[in-house]
Amino acid sequence: MRKTKIVVPIMLTELAELEKVSVSDYRTADIVEWRADFLSADEILEMAPKFFEKFKESKILFTLRTVREGGNIQVSEKKYLQILKEILTYNPAYIDVEFFTHGPSFAALKDFRDKMVLSYHNFDEVPSDLTNRLIKMHEEGTAFVKVAVMPERECDVLDLLQITRDMTLEYGDHFISMAMGDLGRLSRISGYLTGSCWTFASLENSSAPGQISLKETEYILDILEK
Amino acid sequence: MRKTKIVVPIMLTELAELEKVSVSDYRTADIVEWRADFLSADEILEMAPKFFEKFKESKILFTLRTVREGGNIQVSEKKYLQILKEILTYNPAYIDVEFFTHGPSFAALKDFRDKMVLSYHNFDEVPSDLTNRLIKMHEEGTAFVKVAVMPERECDVLDLLQITRDMTLEYGDHFISMAMGDLGRLSRISGYLTGSCWTFASLENSSAPGQISLKETEYILDILEK
């Protein structure tokens, strides 16, 4: 059994697209991430029942990636919370909550911590306070803590691997980390060493810079995690 | 062009085997390593002219890996030096010299430093003095400095990646490092980050624990070094 779980995002830009999606394409994904932020708020709530019905055999991670954290949707705090609350009624395996951008929503959803992937994305750099941010997020007691950062130099990637390892040794196996871009690719396949629990792999178009395809990720992890 | 060069070892155990070797199997290897230590000293010297003729289109690394450094041949210092001297007459691209095990031979061959892969192998651990050993080896001014060590824990591998990166930044692009065993596999494909110049990949049977096949290594490096 593979140590690092593979999450495959699905990014639908129109309601009609859901029908064309072939669930079997996602059959080897450990988790399907519905990156809902390619739709409007109303479209998300309209699509939700059909999406969760269609993927009822899959573990679903619901993610509303906002513009400030590199995503596509711009919503008020109120609307962000409202969408997450409604999605929770469909009982997804996990929901992503942007800790530093949507603190109030996180506070309002604390009862669902066992479903939460508390996330932080930095598309500019690997911030020097990353360790403190990770500890802060860890202390909230969510299922997972996820960080995605942008390395500027090789050492940034190596530092992230080391930080993830230290966090895992210190606080346990619930961290997910990735360095984005071409430089960061190694971080997407090094979970067996660092303890990073998940890796995000694309079916076709990637949902973040430096992402590797599902097929390639499976091939590489099967070699590294022999 | 691939940043990390792929070295493929060839380990012949009998004189008659050379004829059966298909040179085209090695055509995508950047360097062919003749791991001669699977033969006796006399067999090596007898095979040499045919080997160098057969692989005249390839860059050849000649390696006599002694028992003390994880290899198969046990020879006196005198015999070790005699073999290397004779092999040098065939003008291989590189020769491996075990720095800490065969210091006198290294001293006697200093004129060939531009062909030398100065090597150190530790099959037990990642020694705490690894950085000092690397600096000491670097100071000898050889073409490459190669270390292969055995990690006991995940942090050992991450430390090796960091040390290799630091060495490369400090002293330039002539280090080759690998952590052996299953744990160390990531180090065999992370040259684009650490600066490790070569990786050793097997055609079929691996010549060191944790080695990845040539085909797999090419596939992975083409993804990571995009």
UniProtKB/Swiss-Prot annotation, chains A, B:
Annotated positions binding 3-dehydroquinate: E33, W34, R35, R65, R188, S207, Q211
Any single biological process term in GO: 3,4-dihydroxybenzoate biosynthetic process
Entry's family note: Belongs to the type-I 3-dehydroquinase family.
Stored SUPFAM superfamilies: Aldolase
EC number assigned by the record: 4.2.1.10
Classification of source organism: Bacteria, Bacillati, Bacillota, Bacilli, Lactobacillales
Domain of life: Bacteria
Molecular functions per Gene Ontology: 3-dehydroquinate dehydratase activity
Catalysed reactions, as listed in the record: 3-dehydroquinate = 3-dehydroshikimate + H2O
Pathways per UniProt: Metabolic intermediate biosynthesis; chorismate biosynthesis; chorismate from D-erythrose 4-phosphate and phosphoenolpyruvate: step 3/7
Subunit structure: Homodimer.
Organism encoding this protein: Lactococcus lactis subsp. lactis (strain IL1403) (Streptococcus lactis)
Protein name: 3-dehydroquinate dehydratase
Active site (catalytic residues): H121 (proton donor/acceptor), K146 (schiff-base intermediate with substrate)
Keywords: Amino-acid biosynthesis, Aromatic amino acid biosynthesis, Lyase, Schiff base
Role this protein plays: Involved in the third step of the chorismate pathway, which leads to the biosynthesis of aromatic amino acids. Catalyzes the cis-dehydration of 3-dehydroquinate (DHQ) and introduces the first double bond of the aromatic ring to yield 3-dehydroshikimate.
